[in-house]
Amino acid sequence: MLDLYRRTVARFPLGSVSYMFAYGSGVKQQEGYGKVGNGNNLRPPPGTVVDLVFCVRDARGFHAENLHRHPDHYSALRHLGPNFVAKYQERLGAGVYCNTLVPLPDVGITIKYGVVSQEELLEDLLDWRHLYLAGRLHKPVTNLVNPSDNPPLKAALERNLVSALQVALLLLPEKFTAYGLFHTIAGLSYKGDFRMIFGENKQKVHNIVSPQINDFFALYQPSLGQLSDYVAVNMKGQEPGSRKPAIIFEQDKSSSATCQHLRQLPRELQKRLQRNAACRGDYTQVVNHLSMASQLPEVLQASVNDIVWRSSVTQSIKNIPSAGILKSLAYSYRKAQKTFAV
C-alpha cells in the first residue's frame, strides 16, 4: 500500500472492516483538477478532498472504537454514543454515516469518510436500493482493504458492474464508442442527483471519464466478457463530430437480447420500471412490452433517476447533523463553487 494511504488508514479501527476504498478527484485523475501523483509521489491535487468508504461488519463496534480514538471527527451526535450513531447510520438515508472535512495534518490532506454496514452495501450492490455507493462503485476506485477474501461481497461488486453495463446497453444505440459507453455508465448515478442542480460541476461525468478511459476498460473487461454474446468490439473509428480515434462497440438490439437484459436488472430498478411503464401487469408483462417499445431508454433513465433522486436528497439531509452546521456550510460552499467552474 502506498505510504500516504497506509498512514491514513492505520489510524482507524480496522478489525470489523471488510472492504475499504478511496474515490473522487483527490484519488483519481479528473479533468479540471491538478495532477494526481502516482507511485511514491502520490499526492492529491491542491484543494481536493480524499473520499474514503469503510464497509464494516459491526457498525456499533466500529463507531465505539472510532469515537474513542477520534471524537473530533464527529459532530455533536458523538454525545449520544455509538449505539445512536450506528442506528443513525443504518436507518436513515442511503445507510451511510459521513464525517466530513476531517483534516489530517500529519499527512497533509483533508478527508471525508463514510461508514456503511456490509449488509447495507450488499443490498445496494445487488438490488440498487439506493444506487448510492453502488453508483460510486460503477467508476474506478482505489481499494485499500481488498474484498478478495469475502466471496459474497466480491460477487456483489462484480454483479453491480454487470448491472451497470446492462443498463448502459439498454440506453445506447446499436453502435457506440468506448467513451459513450463509459460516459453512460458513469452518468447513471449523477443524472438524477439533485446536487447536480447546484452542487456539482455540470461537466463532472465528462471530467471523470475522459482521463480514465483505460481504467474504465480495466474495470469493465470481465463484465464485457460475461456479456460477449450481446456486445463486442466491432472496429476502430472516430468519435462523433471529431477526428479523434475511437473504439467502436456493436451490440445485439434484438427484442430477445433486450428482454434478457431487462430480466436481470436489479430488483429496485425493476420495481421502478413497473411503476413508470405504460403497460400495467407483472414484471414479465412489463419486460415484454418494453422490449418492443421505442420509449424504453426514456422510461429506463427516468426509473434510474427516481432511485438516485430519493437517495441523494435523503442522504444529503442526513449528512447535515452528522457533519455539523459549520462543516456542512463549508462543504456545500466547496460544492457550489464547482457549479460555476468553467
From Swiss-Prot:
| Principal location class | mitochondrion
Please name the Pfam families in this protein's record.
Tam41_Mmp37
What's in the GO CC field? Answer: mitochondrial inner membrane; mitochondrion
Membrane topology is: Peripheral membrane protein
> In terms of domain of life, where is this protein from?
Eukaryota
EC annotation from Swiss-Prot or TrEMBL: 2.7.7.41
Kindly state which keywords UniProt assigns to this record, in alphabetical order: Lipid biosynthesis, Lipid metabolism, Magnesium, Membrane, Mitochondrion, Mitochondrion inner membrane, Nucleotidyltransferase, Phospholipid biosynthesis, Phospholipid metabolism, Transferase
A GO molecular function for this record? phosphatidate cytidylyltransferase activity
Q: How are cofactors bound according to the entry's free-text note?
A: Magnesium. Also active with cobalt or copper.
Q: In which pathway does it act?
A: Phospholipid metabolism; CDP-diacylglycerol biosynthesis; CDP-diacylglycerol from sn-glycerol 3-phosphate: step 3/3
Gene Ontology biological-process entries: cardiolipin biosynthetic process; CDP-diacylglycerol biosynthetic process
Q: Where in the cell is it found?
A: Mitochondrion inner membrane
In terms of InterPro entries, this protein maps to: Tam41
The cofactors it requires, by name, are:
Mg(2+); Co(2+); Cu(2+)
Catalytic activity of the protein = a 1,2-diacyl-sn-glycero-3-phosphate + CTP + H(+) = a CDP-1,2-diacyl-sn-glycerol + diphosphate
- Family recorded in the similarity comment: Belongs to the TAM41 family.
Role according to the record: Catalyzes the formation of CDP-diacylglycerol (CDP-DAG) from phosphatidic acid (PA) in the mitochondrial inner membrane. Required for the biosynthesis of the dimeric phospholipid cardiolipin, which stabilizes supercomplexes of the mitochondrial respiratory chain in the mitochondrial inner membrane.
Specify the protein name.
Phosphatidate cytidylyltransferase, mitochondrial
